[in-house]
A protein has these predicted regions:
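Conserved glycosyltransferase catalytic-site signature
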Residues: 11, 55, 112-119
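Short active-site oxyanion
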Residues: 47-51, 85-88, 126-129
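Short, flexible loop segments at the rims of nucleotide/cofactor-binding pockets, characterized by
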Residues: 27-30, 106-111
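Short, hydrophobic alpha-helix immediately C-terminal to the catalytic nucleophile
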Residues: 59-62, 119-123
Length: 175
C-alpha cells in the first residue's frame, strides 16, 4: 500500500497534454492547467504521486482533433496510458458500476455514464483529487462529490503535487 498522494486524471487532460505538448501553444486560459498536467505526469513517472484513471480512458483518448491521429499522438497515448510507468489504470468492475449508479441513487449526483464511472473509480481507489477541465458533470457536482471525500478541480488547483514539481512547470514535453 502506498502513502503517496493519489490523483485521478480525467481523459480530457491526457488529450490536451498530447495536443499541446508545448503548453504555450494552447489557448491562454488553458496553459497553466496543461503545465500542471505535465508536471503531475512527471511526478507520477518519478514516483512522487500516483496517477490513476479508468481503463475507459484508453477508449476516450483516440485523437487530439486530427483524423487520423498522427503516429506521435498514438505513441504518446500508448506510452502514458498503457506502459504502467506513469498512469495506473483501473479496470471497471461490478463494484465500480454500482458505485457509479449509487452516486445518483444515494447522493443525488447526476452524471453521464462515463463521468459516473470516472468519479466512482476515483472514490473506489481512494483518490483525494479528481482532475478535469470538463466543466459539465463532475465540476457541476463538485460540492456534492466533495462530501464523499473527493475534490473535483482543474490541474492548476492541485494541492497534492510536490513543491519541487510545481517549480519545474515551464514548457515541458509530454512524457
Amino acid at each position: 500500500m502506498t502513502d503517496k498522494p493519489k490523483i485521478y486524471v480525467d481523459s480530457c487532460c491526457f488529450i490536451d497534454a498530447a495536443k499541446y505538448q508545448d503548453a504555450s501553444s494552447a489557448p491562454a486560459d488553458e496553459q497553466e492547467d496543461i503545465k500542471y498536467i505535465q508536471q503531475i505526469l512527471k511526478a507520477a513517472e518519478s514516483g512522487d504521486v500516483v496517477v490513476h484513471t479508468s481503463s475507459l480512458t484508453i477508449a476516450e483518448c483516440q485523437h487530439t482533433g486530427e483524423h487520423p491521429p498522427t503516429d506521435e499522438v498514438k505513441r504518446l497515448f500508448k506510452s502514458v496510458l498503457t506502459s504502467g510507468k506513469i498512469v495506473q489504470l483501473v479496470a471497471d468492475s461490478i463494484f465500480i458500476a454500482e458505485k457509479a449508479r449509487d452516486l445518483r441513487w444515494d447522493h443525488d449526483i447526476t452524471l453521464r455514464g462515463a463521468d459516473a464511472i470516472d468519479v466512482a473509480t476515483a472514490l473506489e481507489i481512494g483518490c483525494k483529487e479528481f482532475i478535469t477541465k470538463d466543466g459539465r458533470g463532475p465540476h457541476k457536482n463538485a460540492a456534492k462529490i466533495a462530501h464523499l471525500g473527493l475534490k473535483v478541480i482543474r490541474a492548476s488547483e492541485t494541492s497534492l503535487l510536490p513543491e519541487h514539481h510545481k517549480k519545474e512547470k515551464q514548457n515541458l514535453n509530454f512524457p
